[in-house]
């Protein structure tokens, strides 16, 4: 049966992961949350009190503590660093506020992109991140770039944080998301931008089910060719 690669990119809290998980489940594809991989690398760096000047040490840690994924009994994606479950710690504010500088380190990106491409080569996949369509899967059959207003994305992050028991201030989140947008789109390595052949979709005010339906319709057209 024909299988394709689906790349979903976009800024923080644009709905990438939520949508990608549903689509992967519906199609029976592998789902890969690349953002969680960079968060895991950031968690490692912070645990060892490393900075952007400690590139070699960060790479050494990634060699020593592999980043892997699992599933809970309820179907929730679990993230491990070595054999430690870091699913919740990597969503804490300190990781969120530091992931931009870690993910901007060329050697970190090179290492994780290689792993992402290796996983993608094994069959149908839905992968979300910030450079999937431009760098990780440049030949993906379907590339989607999700956007949404800063206000809406801050509201989404605010609700997510409260559900996870993480303290949150809506106005602070708006500033943090705007700052993250700037850093992600202006970094020298793999800046956040839509691929030339991607489809941009504004999710502001659009339900998750409608976004999923839009993308799955595009995927079906490709699969039916």
Curated annotation (Swiss-Prot):
GO terms for biological process: nucleobase-containing small molecule interconversion; pyrimidine nucleotide metabolic process. Keywords: ATP-binding, Cytoplasm, Kinase, Nucleotide-binding, Transferase. It catalyses: CMP + ATP = CDP + ADP; dCMP + ATP = dCDP + ADP. It is found in: Cytoplasm. The gene is cmk. ATP binds at residues 10-18. This is Cytidylate kinase. Its EC number is 2.7.4.25.
């Amino acid at each position: 049966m024909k299988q394709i690669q689906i790349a979903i990119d976009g800024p923080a809290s644009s709905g990438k992961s939520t949508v990608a998980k549903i689509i992967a489940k519906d199609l029976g594809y592998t789902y890969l949350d690349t953002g969680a991989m960079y968060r895991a690398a950031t968690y490692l760096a912070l645990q060892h009190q490393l900075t952007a000047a400690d590139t070699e040490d960060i790479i050494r840690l990634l060699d020593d503590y592999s980043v892997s994924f699992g599933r809970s009994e309820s179907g929730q994606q679990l993230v491990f660093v070595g054999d430690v479950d870091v699913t919740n710690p990597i969503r804490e504010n300190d990781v969120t506020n530091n992931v931009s500088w870690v993910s901007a380190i060329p050697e970190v990106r090179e290492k994780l992109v290689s792993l992402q491409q290796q996983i993608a080569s094994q069959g149908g996949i839905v992968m979300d991140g910030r450079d999937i369509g431009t760098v990780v899967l440049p030949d993906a059959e379907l590339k989607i770039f999700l956007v949404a207003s800063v206000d809406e994305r801050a509201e989404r992050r605010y609700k997510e944080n409260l559900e996870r028991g993480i303290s949150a201030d809506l106005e602070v989140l708006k500033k943090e998301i705007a700052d993250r947008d700037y850093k992600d789109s202006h970094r020298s390595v793999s800046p956040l931008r839509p691929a030339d052949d991607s489809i941009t979709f504004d999710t502001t005010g659009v339900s998750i089910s409608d976004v999923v339906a839009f993308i799955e319709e595009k995927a079906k057209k490709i699969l039916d060719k």
